[in-house]
């Protein structure tokens, strides 16, 4: 839910500085999750609103603009996967956004003023996918790369060559780089999620995430199986095409055999833009692919050149984003469900309504405070939209439609799953069930234990966990390692092959390093990063279980609250018995690293940032070496940074380090220190 922003003109200088810094940090985090991890933390409309607020703040208070601000960079921060890096010949810019016709009219007025007269526009549908650059040499596809941070992307050539829509050879022997969008058609997305659910895997949240995750696979067979498609819409080298307009470029792309969207339209006045937007707002669900807006581009390429670009966006184009589609429905009931950590969450059960192409009947109400703020009662008529076209969310209650017999919700006092008394922990908004034997928590906890970022037991998703619990084959994480093929064959949809495959995955998970096991145990407030820091420090699960609050809290990056949660978890007889059973099943309980961290290392406890291209080592290798020597390797520079190691072509991070007075080393200084440390 969006915060209520104080009008900018009413902010004090100090308030503006604090809010700007907070939004800069928050949006970097959200951008990294969206662009790098393909796992958005917030819906698009929330990100867009926060970003627009930051732009407005930085325009009013330019003294608070920093090089690392999301407004100064395109896309994600430095990429971090195993895919090879590619430097783009020209920056891959993103588009500026507007969210209303008034804002679009303002953009048109500025553009017309800059050009001196009204120019024709080419209108295109905004495809909801992943930006890609395709390089052809003598008509042959030789390279494909993602946007990345706009300057450096990832090489996905092998993956892109599996996409049937993208030709490996053009109809003419041109040497040219073109850009476009890779997407997953709606039918492919529905089929993929149906198969994933049948396999007991988590379904993808939306086609965009599915496309991004599919394209960045290290196994090209997976990419090929996902039935991706693409549209091409841009080149920075129009002279190679012999065209003078954007609409002409699209026609030439098609002649070359490249896939293009044929819904573009050239218009001469703003009223036609509104008609085009209205047309595709109503027709978007009938398209075979997802769109989230309309792109308006100055059609004449020479005028595009005259208008130019900012550091982040072109001045000659703008994206109009569709508002979330809304529908009216009635709240029939409010149900309360229990999560992995015992948080009890209300969910609205509503009359089914068709929204953004799917039938929606449920929406999360988050917590009792949210319910009170929205004043939602059973029987109310409410507006419903999909936040980011993904997550159903109630907008507001239509009070004039409230029936006289509407029912005020009843906040439960006992757990809906196990009937234990619920508690309200000070400082938290959620109600919580603290019964360790709660059936709902057990199912959620087992699913978490098997998840990809924990023990990574492929094929053991929520459906399979539910079946195993119902059959009485498992009761806690230790019992997972006692499942047999014979037991699995009694469950729905299991055959010999799938049963053996799951048992193999369970056995493979026994060899995981300690940090995965720690994270998988589901200890409150212990995420993947905290689990790694703790595993590195204590090396064995036994040592962690015997550590004091002070011992754990002394780890750089682990606070007192997390330490208390860990000690409390391991203090129970049930947890102690669990460790014994895991050990007897052969589950590794040690940190698997060849290096014992030397607390006397120069890097121990220091926050280090790597930037630029390293010539003598890869970024992942340097990161691992630093972590093995006790450093906390961060992705951005702040006042808490102890050291920046700068390779070739270091950019904004180096500039910020200089501004803040942070110590900066060359790569050679780092290598010299490595030699010294390794020779101890």
From Swiss-Prot:
Pfam families: BRCT, DNA_ligase_aden, DNA_ligase_OB, DNA_ligase_ZBD, HHH_2, HHH_5
HAMAP family in UniProt: DNA_ligase_A
Active site (catalytic residues): 126 (n6-amp-lysine intermediate)
Major enzyme class: ligase
Binding site for Zn(2+): 415, 418, 433, 438
Role played: DNA ligase that catalyzes the formation of phosphodiester linkages between 5'-phosphoryl and 3'-hydroxyl groups in double-stranded DNA using NAD as a coenzyme and as the energy source for the reaction. It is essential for DNA replication and repair of damaged DNA.
Gene name for this UniProt entry: ligA
Segments forming a coiled coil: none
GO terms assigned for molecular function: DNA binding; DNA ligase (NAD+) activity; metal ion binding
SUPFAM superfamilies recorded: BRCT domain, DNA ligase/mRNA capping enzyme, catalytic domain, Nucleic acid-binding proteins, RuvA domain 2-like
Key word Repeat present: no
Protein name as annotated: DNA ligase
InterPro entries to which the protein is assigned, alphabetical: BRCT_dom, BRCT_dom_sf, DisA/LigA_HHH, DNA_ligase, DNA_ligase_AS, DNA_ligase_CS, DNAligase_adenylation, DNAligase_N
Keyword terms, alphabetized: DNA damage, DNA repair, DNA replication, Ligase, Magnesium, Manganese, Metal-binding, NAD, Zinc
Keyword Manganese included in the entry's annotation: yes
Reactions performed catalytically: NAD(+) + (deoxyribonucleotide)n-3'-hydroxyl + 5'-phospho-(deoxyribonucleotide)m = (deoxyribonucleotide)n+m + AMP + beta-nicotinamide D-nucleotide
SMART domains with a match to the protein in the record: BRCT, HhH1, LIGANc
Cofactor(s) for this UniProt protein: Mg(2+); Mn(2+)
GO process terms (BP): DNA repair; DNA replication
Chain sites annotated for binding NAD(+): 44-48, 94-95, 124, 147, 181, 297, 321
The enzyme's E.C. designation: 6.5.1.2
Lineage: Bacteria, Bacillati, Bacillota, Bacilli, Lactobacillales
The species this protein was found in: Leuconostoc mesenteroides subsp. mesenteroides (strain ATCC 8293 / DSM 20343 / BCRC 11652 / CCM 1803 / JCM 6124 / NCDO 523 / NBRC 100496 / NCIMB 8023 / NCTC 12954 / NRRL B-1118 / 37Y)
